[in-house]
Amino acid sequence: MTEVEAKATATEETTKEEEEAPETTAEQTEESAQETSENVSKLEASTIRQLEYYFGDANLARDKFLQEQISKDEGWVPVDVLLTFKRLKSLSEDKKVIVDAIEKSDEGLIEVSEDREKLRRHPERPLPEQNEETRKEIYGRTVYVKGFAPEEGTQMSELLEFFEPFEKITNIVMRKYHDKATKKYLFKGSVFVTFATKDHCAEFLKKEKLGYKGKELIRKMQDDYFEEKKAERRKKDKKKEEDRFNIDHLPKGASVHLSGFNKDTSRETIKETILKLDESLEVAFIDYAKTDTEGTVRFAADDAGKKFMEKLTDSKIQIDEEEITARLLEGDEEKEFLRKVVKDQQARRQASNARNKGRTPEGRQASRPPQEWRRKAKGGRGE
């Protein structure tokens, strides 16, 4: 049996809690659990698979409880302790059955102590270093598969049986979510399947059609699945951002970009020049700072920018003895500018609120006349 691959989506649950963990995993042998020699029973094959899952790469890397047990006695873990794990206990509570089974494994991952009371991961099979390189390597041979009828209560045993014909699957992860109504982790209907090699992974994806209980399965590389999810999140975030900075209330066709200012031009000069051109044009705001060479004028009414442009010759206007080039903002450029306007407005509002909140009650009271003075001023009983 191959070692369990380090799961990219590993949880912090201990082995004792694995029945409630957000994900359920299972290891299979390279030849699959069913392709054992004739002298290994189905029970023994299941026992071997479960024990090698406990001591395998994926589980051992995240299982704090088992790590603690391993640290106590040169890696040895009493079989009695392992039998407190529900899944192993459900297979057999007989220590002899457990030990006899693991001794029949061809994988060589687990050692049995001389007194047959303890098990440990073989010292010559150290746990691989858990780093970014390892994670990427595993992602490169892991497939996302969806369509396993969660409403029918699909079990890991059914998934193991389904994937049995495919070559050298080393790990299966049942993806789960927390259901608030039942307060339980329920199967999503999708799994991550890790193959021993990239070639086996590619062969699995090349199969034309693959179904489960009459439903075609969706298959893609885990990396591709994650990238698609990232793209979906970015799209949702962008929509949230657009909703947050809604520009519907701002006038359209009212923003004009001006370029060519000298360093001494002020906003007041720009506004005065525009009003001299047409005093009916109401300027809402000028996005410009002195010494800038360009800026944007936002008018207060719809299409006021268009009206302003119609009064220019060749899109030019003279400001501070400089020939300034004007350009009406339209389409995406206008939307982007108006979103910036809303962001700036919100930032100024938040800064103002923060300043107001920063005032102490004592400070606010000190700015007002004492209560006795107010009474006297109103003709009240001050004495």
UniProtKB/Swiss-Prot annotation:
Compartments in which it is found: Nucleus; Cytoplasm
Start-end of Acidic residues biased regions: 15-33
An annotated Gene Ontology molecular function: mRNA binding
Top-rank taxon, per record: Eukaryota
CC annotations in GO: cytoplasmic stress granule; cytosol; nucleus; ribonucleoprotein complex
Domain called HTH La-type RNA-binding: residue spans: 37-129
Keywords: Cytoplasm, DNA-binding, Nucleus, RNA-binding
xRRM domain mapped to chain residues: 249-368
Domain RRM residues, every copy: 141-228
Residue segments, region Disordered: 1-43, 343-383
Database matches in Pfam families: La, RRM_3
CDD domains, per database record: LARP_3, RRM1_La, RRM2_La
UniProt record, GO biological process: positive regulation of translation; tRNA processing
InterPro entries per the UniProt record, alphabetical: La_dom_prot, La_HTH, La_xRRM, Lupus_La, Nucleotide-bd_a/b_plait_sf, RBD_domain_sf, RRM_dom, WH-like_DNA-bd_sf
Job description of the protein: May be involved in transcription termination by RNA polymerase III. Binds RNA and DNA. Binds to the 3' end of the minus strand of Sindbis virus RNA. This may be significant for Sindbis virus RNA replication.
This protein's name: La protein homolog
Native organism taxonomy: Eukaryota, Metazoa, Ecdysozoa, Arthropoda, Hexapoda
